[in-house]
């Protein structure tokens, strides 16, 4: 965003984003890592081009401001989420055993390079929103043997570099308790131990706050893990942003959420509603045993 000329302001005063965040008590940032976010001709895919070099620059800025880092391995060259988990270009054609080794080697090598650069993360999540698996099709749900194999390879690699670095496994849809129980029951039978269950929670998609709370409590009690809301946000307006986007009608992607979904929210899409929602999220984390923090996304 900064490379495109964006500037950050606090009450009308321009400032460095990390200065502003620190002044408001932010103590940790979540940085994603893509394997090779470029075309075969070397053209960046965009969206921040979050390769290892970008990670090191951002992590240094955050750490210089006293913040910890949650490193988010996607194990993909671009976005990985429940709707897509593409194998990195360099790993295409590998079988499950080869992918397992590739995950281990890549995770270990990148962490060692981060360590040498003085930007080793304080927390690592092995995969991003793994609800439907990772590195499809071999690691696509319901291939739980391979899912556990790939995730466990990443966990072992983290432990080999920093045995005290907590490891997170992150799913989406934080209000869906049956899905979490099913996923983690399968994983626990097969996979390496880990430390934290990460959840995504967007209120227009992922159920009510009460459903989120019930799931957090059950996960902490059932599996004995800390709980982090790894992604959470709430809008403050339904105003059309066409004037800011400056794209033609055929190029616009539209709202992040639909007006019909907003109608069912317990909070209005206003600055006051956004603040109330986030205050309730923070209170929930404080109240739930094992609640350990959140990352606004």
What annotation goes with each model-predicted range?
Residues 1-57, 61-68, 76-102, 198, ...:
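N-terminal substrate-binding region of glycoside hydrolase catalytic domains
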């Amino acid at each position: 965003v900064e490379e495109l000329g964006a500037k950050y302001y606090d009450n009308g005063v321009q400032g460095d984003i990390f200065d502003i965040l620190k002044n408001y008590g932010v103590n940790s940032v979540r940085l994603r890592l893509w394997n090779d976010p470029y075309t075969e001709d070397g053209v960046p895919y965009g969206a921040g081009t979050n390769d290892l070099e970008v990670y090191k620059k951002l992590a240094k800025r955050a750490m210089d401001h006293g913040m910890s880092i949650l490193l988010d391995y996607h194990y993909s060259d671009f976005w990985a989420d429940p709707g897509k988990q593409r194998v990195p270009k360099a790993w295409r054609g590998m079988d499950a055993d080869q992918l397992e080794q590739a995950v281990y080697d890549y995770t270990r090598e990148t962490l060692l390079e981060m360590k040498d650069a003085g930007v080793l993360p304080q927390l690592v999540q092995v995969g991003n929103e793994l609800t439907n698996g990772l590195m499809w099709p071999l690691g696509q749900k319901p291939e739980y043997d391979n899912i556990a194999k790939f995730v466990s390879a990443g966990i072992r690699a983290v432990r080999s570099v920093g045995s005290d670095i907590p490891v997170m496994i992150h799913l989406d849809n934080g209000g869906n308790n049956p899905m979490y129980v099913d996923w983690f029951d399968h994983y626990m039978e097969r996979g390496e131990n880990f430390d934290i269950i990460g959840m995504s929670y967007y209120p227009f998609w992922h159920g009510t706050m009460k459903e989120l709370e019930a799931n957090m409590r059950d996960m902490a009690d059932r599996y004995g893990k800390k709980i982090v809301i790894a992604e959470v946000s709430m809008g403050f307006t339904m105003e059309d942003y066409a004037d800011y986007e400056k794209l033609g009608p055929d190029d616009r992607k539209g709202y992040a959420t639909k007006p019909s979904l907003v109608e069912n929210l317990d909070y209005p899409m206003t600055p006051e509603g956004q603040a109330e929602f986030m205050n309730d999220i923070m209170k929930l984390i404080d109240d739930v045993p094992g609640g350990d923090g959140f990352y606004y996304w």
